[in-house]
Amino acid sequence: MAVCIVVCMIVGYLFGCIQTGYIVGRVNKIDIRDYGSGNSGTTNTLRTLGKTAAIITFLGDAVKGLVGVNLARYVIMPAFHVEGEAYLWLLTGFAVVLGHNFPFYLGFKGGKGIATTGGVIFAFHWQLGLVCAAVFLICLLYTSDAADEL
């Protein structure tokens, strides 16, 4: 069981280290971290590269949260004959967000983890994920400077 926990955490962290904003920036021949706020998240991508790049970044970061947890749930845990341990899903989700926020290969400077956390929530309970997404969008539209860019 301890080995399964360690494997879930390591795989989750490494999966989270995939920086969609950084990759989108590189495709556009820039280092996104050299612009705006200096992080590789969706908002900085929106302000630097526009809506299409931001949507790709947001979806990529959210999907890695969703896939990271489900990878532990449906691949890693069954390989270790571990069933129904929801706390392992939570630990894996936490590791994915940590990997997103603090990727080792970018000097431990990544995004803020909003989209990735949303993906983790969707992995646990998709209905709750929809409610959280609706609340987030309402708050974003009414309180954020980023809403002006949408």
Give the positions of each predicted feature.
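Helix-boundary and loop/linker segments of multi-pass membrane transporters
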Residues: T43-R47, H81-E83, K109
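Cytosolic, membrane-interface loops and tails of multi-pass inner-membrane proteins
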Residues: Y22-T52
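Alpha-helical transmembrane segments in multi-pass membrane proteins
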Residues: C8, G12, C17, G21, ...
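Conserved small/polar residues in nucleotide/adenosyl-binding loops
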Residues: Y142-L150
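Short, non-helical or kinked segments that cap or interrupt transmembrane helices
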Residues: D31-T42, Y105-G118, D145
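Interfacial segments of multi-pass membrane proteins
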Residues: L46-K51, A72-I76, G113-L141
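Nucleotide and nucleotide-moiety/phosphate-recognizing core
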Residues: C4, A53-T57, V63-Y105, Q127-L128, ...
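Feature marks short, highly hydrophobic, charge-poor N-terminal signal-anchor/signal peptide-like helices
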Residues: M1-V7
